[in-house]
Amino acid sequence: MSAAQARHLTTLATGRYGFELQTLMERAGESLAGLAAHLAPDGPVLVVAGRGHNGGVGLAAAHCLARARRAVWVVPTHEAENYSGVPKELLERLAELPNVRLRSSLPKMKFSCALDAAVGMRLEGPPRGRTLDVITVLNNLGCKVLSLDVPTGLAADSGEVPGDVVRASATLALALPKPGTPPGGVVGDLYLASFDLPEALFHDVGLEPFVAPSPWARIV
């Protein structure tokens, strides 16, 4: 599924099919949190979240992990005032949870797992600035890194790497894998979360759905 098809899928889901965007993000976040818990059953988790849909799912995953009594550190990629809509609401709710720490910079400590929800499919040119800093830190944490849809720095459609890129241990694709994310390399192990979208929705975008046998399935 290309980046354009993914955007079209979301537009139809929240329009013609009547899904709330928050519901979609929370479903995807549950899958992301569940896979993170599978890969790293205990210990603190770092969540790096951008201000778009990818970041919103990362923030929803942080909620799920916090409810499961995991210690969660959340580092937004932008200042709080730059977040809007569902991601903003999720960020504000996270600030109220006792086992969640919001940080403006990446903490120097040991994590069992880090969630890369910084950019997703909206990569434009080589990463720079804050995004480049995030990539550098994630690659040097020494823990498992789980990317959402695509590792930050990787072009979802082409698989090109125009600059630095997150070297993920695993990547969770939402709905369908993206063309530039075959298993291995910087993608790591590839998993798919289908989260119960109607088959007709995929057909409307010209795609065949894949229904995972559990909240996620590994693609080999």
Swiss-Prot record:
Catalytic activity from the UniProt record: (6R)-NADHX = (6S)-NADHX; (6R)-NADPHX = (6S)-NADPHX
Chain's role: Catalyzes the epimerization of the S- and R-forms of NAD(P)HX, a damaged form of NAD(P)H that is a result of enzymatic or heat-dependent hydration. This is a prerequisite for the S-specific NAD(P)H-hydrate dehydratase to allow the repair of both epimers of NAD(P)HX.
EC number: 5.1.99.6
Cofactor: K(+)
GO function terms (MF aspect): metal ion binding; NAD(P)HX epimerase activity; nucleotide binding
Gene responsible for this protein: nnrE
Domain YjeF N-terminal: 6-203
Protein name stated in the entry: NAD(P)H-hydrate epimerase
Cofactor note: Binds 1 potassium ion per subunit.
Protein's UniProt keywords contain Nucleus: no
Similarity-based family: Belongs to the NnrE/AIBP family.
Keywords: Isomerase, Metal-binding, NAD, NADP, Nucleotide-binding, Potassium
Binding site for K(+): N54, D116, T152
Annotated binding of (6S)-NADPHX, by residue: H53, N54, G55, G56, V57, G120, M121, R122, L123, E124, G125, P126, D149
Any Pfam family the entry gives: YjeF_N
